[in-house]
């Protein structure tokens, strides 16, 4: 096989040539994977090959051993591991050799390949000398290309390999990357690569960072890099400071005082926007960290504990100097930029919002002075900045302080909705949304509501970006002024007809520019959810229009030509289904008059939509709403619906769809009760398969356990058929624990898993008790108490899990009132569990449940 020739052809503009070359390479990989890998590695290392061919070889090699999808990634890993040791060694040796290439594309491709292999082999100690080699490559006197590409490799490895695996190498890695980042390094490309590697390594060098001497040296090198004449190095250095502030806020007071305040303020004024963006991001990160610290302090105080962390007040101390800079940067709008392009004025606005949340009332006066000075300015940049500044400080300061200011500003802002400049109108619509979100009590319905609604209605006929913000403002208004318990009317009722009419026009567009159509549908759904009884005839009319649109969209499936059309069509159908869901929930049982037509169209939508379409989830959610509204009357649709539900349950690849399907099985059980029994064998088989699947996302599994509870409650003692298998699964799941030092994701998963187990136990216990078959669960009582003991001993246990555990404890006590389980209830941890539900910070629901469970347990003692 001539690898170079085929690789060149994969880049051909001729589709036939390109496809043939790709096919030849695929065949070569299937026929002799070892030879295929060696040939590609040789091509990557070949200095006589064209750069683009070498890059293609590196990419093909990387794609042969790694993938985004976990299942395929595992398959490729096994394929790589199956290669003879000498073949793997040859590929790795050629990749390391290529790191020294003066051709950057080849060196970078080699760096990515080495990191991809390292992701497998470092964890199993199959490449023990890799990091030693890379660190040596960065040493004094080595060629610049070798340094640069080795540093990039270190960065890629730090991104993809677990910190636990690399922690033993942290000293060597840090020495290498910091040495490369020093101002004494003459090659800017090497210095930039070193800063990139430092950025990627910061998470696992905590031990080094806690050492004051090492920390001082790292901070010195990074701070010096912010003063480089190269903008790219400055940007990378400020990026490192952003991450350092995020990871090591608690160690920053000395550096803030000595250097960081001055450096970042100077950086915000930099004429290179990328540098300025990172400097602003630094202060956004300061604010985010102080918001987080404040939450932790409040939580500790609620528990009568000493806070573990201190708010150093960086934002408050710097506000007087930083706020004027941010306000000035607000005026640097780029009218030619796309809305999705992140620029300095957007970054400044975001930073201003975060400052408002941290410093509160302190921000109001300086911002108000800026607003008053610029709100009427002939220069639209100043006007828009004034509106942006006002809208940015509405979350954080005391509402009582803001209310008179909002009262004064509203008439001005409403008038600015007809400003001749689109950017001003867009920001004004956003500011009205901010007011209706955070200071809605300042809106006087008798004075402000009518002109505000009129201005927003006018905005719905404007540019799509303005439409989206007007929709958001309407959603906030409708939520705030919602009728209490769907009473006959609300202050928003007189405007419903006009708003709904405008939204139906907005949503009747072929395109979805600036997300305007989707925003329109979301707003329509919100209006329906919070509608008063008096507008239900209007909602019925909306239902008719939505069903017509859904039917038309089904007929259009055959006319879709390309990926863009498919995405647009899927989004439209999802929006229609979401509005239908709102209508079904709002009408409740009264939806029965239209349910035949709705169900027919929803099932057609599922049948005609592509297998991978996101529409399936939204259809299922709409059908779930129908189940909850109709309850037992939904039975007529079950035979035609169950095949779709079963298919979704078995779709392990699309875990979100599977998760929705699991929830619907529970809904169906609650709706049908014992009438679900004929379908239980199929459902239980699929649910158990999902639990045992290695492909399905683990976060779906707690919901499956909860679903067992719903099925048990629906069919009572008939659950005996599945009891033994389910109890074995629950016992296995109970053994899952978060290891010491586990991340929050794992801790949350274990908590959710235990919640699902407890809910399953509760449902099964209540089901067999109702049918007087408590004998069925007696063999499993010991497992239940073992789990409850584990939950009680877990310091990370959430309140929802504590509440569920109290419920199970009380149910067991109530179910065996004659003292059959007396010895279990006498354990010391039982009292600890009961007391954990009565703490100061427990919700009233948890306290009530704890009191009830305590009464049940006391009866055990008296039995």
Curated annotation (Swiss-Prot):
The keyword Kinase does not apply. Its main location: cytoplasm. InterPro entries: ARM-like, ARM-type_fold, Armadillo, HEAT_type_2, Importin-beta_N, Importin_beta. One of its GO terms (biological process) is mRNA transport. GO terms for cellular component: cytoplasm; mitotic spindle midzone; nuclear envelope; nuclear periphery; nuclear pore; nucleus. One of its GO terms (molecular function) is GTP binding. It is found in: Cytoplasm; Nucleus envelope; Nucleus, Nuclear pore complex. Disruption phenotype: Essential for growth. Spores germinate, but fail to divide. PROSITE patterns: HEAT_REPEAT, IMPORTIN_B_NT. Keywords: Cytoplasm, mRNA transport, Nuclear pore complex, Nucleus, Protein transport, Repeat, Translocation, Transport. The keyword rRNA processing does not apply. HEAT repeats lie at residues 2-31, 33-62, 85-124, 129-159, 170-201, 212-248, 253-299, 314-360, 364-392, 399-439, 449-481, 496-530, 536-586, 592-630, 635-671, 677-715, 720-767, 778-815, 822-861. Residues 21-101 form the Importin N-terminal domain. Belongs to the importin beta family. Importin beta-1 subfamily. Importin beta subunit that functions in nuclear protein import through association with the importin alpha subunit, which binds to the clasical nuclear localization signal (cNLS) in cargo substrates. Docking of the importin/substrate complex to the nuclear pore complex (NPC) is mediated by importin beta through binding to nucleoporin FxFG repeats and the complex is subsequently translocated through the pore by an energy requiring, Ran-dependent mechanism. At the nucleoplasmic side of the NPC, GTP-Ran binds to importin beta and the three components separate, leading to release of the cargo. Forms a complex with an importin alpha subunit. Interacts with Ran; interacts specifically with the GTP-bound form of Ran (GTP-Ran), protecting it from GTP hydrolysis and nucleotide exchange. Interacts with nucleoporins. This is Importin subunit beta-1. The gene is kap95.
